C-alpha cells in the first residue's frame, strides 16, 4: 500500500515527530511504501533524526509523478497541496484544531478552520478532537489513533526514587516561547513566585523570544534521548498551555518518573488525573500555580505519590509499534471506504466561509471605529491648548484647579493629557 504524508518541513517539533514515527512503523512492520512529501522549498536542513534515513523524502513535484492509495495532509497549510498529489483517497491527520493557534483577528485562523470542511477522511490522536470532528462533520469518516511512546528512549524506571526535602524542587519548563499559547514566560514567572527552594530548567528548541529569564539553566534544542534524561532528573514538569492536541510532554515526563503541574488544557484528560498523578491549576493564576509547586516542595510524600502514580500511568500507555498497527488499519479502512460526499463537504465549506467573512467584517468595523476614536483623541492631545496644559499640569496651582475634573473623569484626563 502506497501512502504519502504531506509535511511543511522536517524541522524538530512534536507534530513532525509523530508523523515520522507513524511512517516508520508502517514501513518497518506493515509493508507500506511511505513517502514524506515536502510541500514547499526548504531553506533549513532537515532535523538530524536517525529514523529519517529509513524513509523516502520527496518534493511536491516528485510526488505528483507518483500515484498513491492514500495521500494524507498533516497540517492545515499542507491541504493546499493535498489534491495535487494523485491518490485514490485523501485523508487529513488532525493533531489539533489548528485555527486555535492564531489570534482571533488573524487571517490564518479562518483559513485553518475552513480546512476541516474538505472532502477527506479524518485521523486524529485525541478523543476531544475526534468528538469535535464528528460533531462538525458527521458525514466524514473519523478515526482515532493515539500517539505512542518510544519506550526505549523514554524508558520507565523500575523504581521511582524518593526525592528528599533537603534538595530543592527540580522544576522543568518546556515549550516554544514564541508560541503565545504555550505561555512559557507565564510558567517561568510562576516558578519565580515560589517561596520554597527550587531549581528551574527551561528547555526550548528556539531561544528567539525567550530573552533574559530567571532560570538556573536554559538548554535546547535537545534530542529525544537528552530530553528523556532531563525528565528523569526533574521532579515536576510545569506546563501552562492554553492550546494542545494530545498533550505529549507530560506523558513523556511520566515515563521518566516526573509528575506534572498543568492547566486543564485540551488533551489533559487522556491520561492526567488531578491529585493522582499530577496537579491541575487554574488559568492565569501565577500565585496559585506557585503555591501548588510550593506544596510539592514541602510535602515530599505527596510528590512521591504523584510521581509513582505517573509512572504507573505510563506503564499502561502503548508504544509506537502498537499504535503503528492502528494507523495501518485506519489507512486501509480509508482506502477501502467510499470517497467522502463532496456535496456535503462543499455545503459545510461555503457555510463556514460565509460565517467567517461576517465575523471578519465585524472585526474590521470595530478596528476602524477604534482607529477613528484614536484619531480624534490624538488631534485633541496635539492641540496647542493641550500641549500648553501638559507643560503646567504638575504645578501646584494647576493640580488644585483640575482636581474636580480629575475626580470626575480621571481616565479621560489621562488620555487627553497623556502620561
Regions inferred by a protein language model and the residue ranges of each:
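Short hydrophobic beta-strand element within catalytic cores of glycosyltransferases
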Residues: 259-262
Amino acid at each position: 500500500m502506497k501512502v504519502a504524508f504531506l509535511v511543511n518541513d522536517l524541522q524538530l517539533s512534536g507534530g513532525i515527530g509523530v508523523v515520522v514515527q507513524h511512517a516508520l512503523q508502517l514501513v518497518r512492520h506493515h509493508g507500506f511504501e511511505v513517502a514524506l512529501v515536502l510541500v514547499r522549498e526548504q531553506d533549513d536542513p532537515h532535523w538530524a533524526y536517525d529514523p529519517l534515513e529509513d524513509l523516502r523524502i520527496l518534493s511536491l513535484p516528485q510526488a505528483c509523478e507518483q500515484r498513491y492509495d492514500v495521500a494524507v495532509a498533516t497540517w492545515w497549510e499542507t491541504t493546499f497541496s493535498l489534491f495535487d498529489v494523485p491518490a485514490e483517497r485523501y485523508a487529513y491527520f488532525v493533531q489539533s484544531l489548528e485555527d486555535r493557534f492564531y489570534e482571533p483577528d488573524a487571517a490564518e485562523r479562518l483559513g485553518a478552520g475552513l480546512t476541516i470542511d474538505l472532502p477527506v477522511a479524518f485521523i486524529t490522536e485525541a478523543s476531544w478532537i475526534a468528538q469535535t470532528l464528528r460533531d462538525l462533520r458527521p458525514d466524514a469518516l473519523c478515526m482515532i489513533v493515539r500517539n505512542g511512546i518510544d519506550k526505549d528512549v523514554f524508558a520507565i524506571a523500575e523504581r521511582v526514587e524518593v526525592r528528599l526535602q533537603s534538595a530543592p524542587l527540580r522544576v522543568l519548563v518546556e515549550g516554544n516561547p514564541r508560541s503565545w499559547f504555550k505561555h512559557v514566560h507565564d510558567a517561568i514567572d510562576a516558578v519565580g513566585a515560589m517561596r520554597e527552594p527550587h531549581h528551574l530548567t527551561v528547555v526550548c528548541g528556539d531561544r528567539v523570544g525567550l530573552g533574559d529569564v530567571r532560570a538556573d539553566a536554559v538548554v535546547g534544542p535537545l534530542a529525544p534521548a537528552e530530553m528523556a534524561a532531563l525528565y528523569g532528573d526533574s521532579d515536576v514538569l510545569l506546563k501552562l498551555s492554553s492550546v494542545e492536541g494530545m498533550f505529549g510532554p507530560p506523558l513523556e515526563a511520566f515515563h521518566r518518573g516526573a509528575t506534572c503541574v498543568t492547566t486543564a488544557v485540551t488533551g489533559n484528560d487522556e491520561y492526567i488525573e488531578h491529585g493522582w498523578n499530577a496537579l491541575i491549576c487554574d488559568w492565569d493564576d501565577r500565585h496559585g500555580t506557585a503555591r501548588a509547586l510550593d506544596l510539592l516542595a514541602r510535602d515530599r510524600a505527596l510528590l512521591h505519590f504523584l510521581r509513582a502514580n505517573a509512572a504507573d500511568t505510563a506503564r499502561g500507555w502503548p508504544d509506537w509499534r502498537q499504535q503503528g498497527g492502528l494507523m495501518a488499519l485506519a489507512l486501509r479502512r480509508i482506502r477501502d471506504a467510499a470517497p467522502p460526499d463532496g456535496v456535503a463537504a462543499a455545503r459545510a465549506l461555503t457555510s463556514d466561509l460565509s460565517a467567517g467573512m461576517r465575523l471578519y467584517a465585524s472585526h474590521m468595523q470595530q478596528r476602524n471605529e477604534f482607529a477613528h476614536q484614536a484619531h480624534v483623541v490624538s488631534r485633541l492631545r496635539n492641540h496647542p491648548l493641550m500641549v500648553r496644559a501638559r507643560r503646567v499640569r504638575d504645578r501646584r496651582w494647576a493640580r488644585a484647579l483640575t482636581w474636580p475634573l480629575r475626580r470626575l473623569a480621571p481616565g479621560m484626563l489621562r488620555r487627553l493629557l497623556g502620561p
